[in-house]
Amino acid sequence: MKKTFLSILAFGMLFTTGAKAQSDKVANDSVTVYEHEYIVKVGDVAPDFTLQMTDGTTFTLSEQRGKVVMLQFTAGWCGICRAEMPHIERDIWQPHKENKDFVLVGIDREETLEEILPFIEQVGTTYPIAMDTNADVFAMYALRNSGITRNILIDRDGKIVMLTRKFKEDEFAALVEKINAMLAE
């Protein structure tokens, strides 16, 4: 009986040590996750990417250096996105669309062009939309399976200055104010 107990105890210690080592390996190999499941934070240089736009052109983030850039991750199946997009159109895009120092790109996640076009027509969006059909660009900024809507504001040096999640009126107002202030500089 005593031998059986000691054998079980030794096996348990071995298993626990192995599990701890495996857990440490996973933690060391994983990305750091910040608030709202972002894997980037304010102050980070925004990860570069190139995506095809709905009009057939391409958009490369690093080519926008020197400009204030807002990325909006969205999708037609996202109710919060549908509620937020008219506000982005009215309060951000319309006042700044002619400003050569400002870039706004909606990034539609996991939808085809055939799905995106009716969606943007329904919500009345006229700002440019890029297609992230596999959510690969989204996964550079947040955990791949985390939710949207998300807005990322990037300064002229390519650094992230603001991250939003969901559509909250006070946070959206702060985003509009931040964009206006950055463009006034």
Regions picked out by a protein language model, each given a short descriptive name:
Residues M1-D48, E185:
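N-terminal targeting signals for export/organelle localization
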Residues M70-L71, L104:
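Hydrophobic beta-strand anchors of alpha/beta hydrolase catalytic cores
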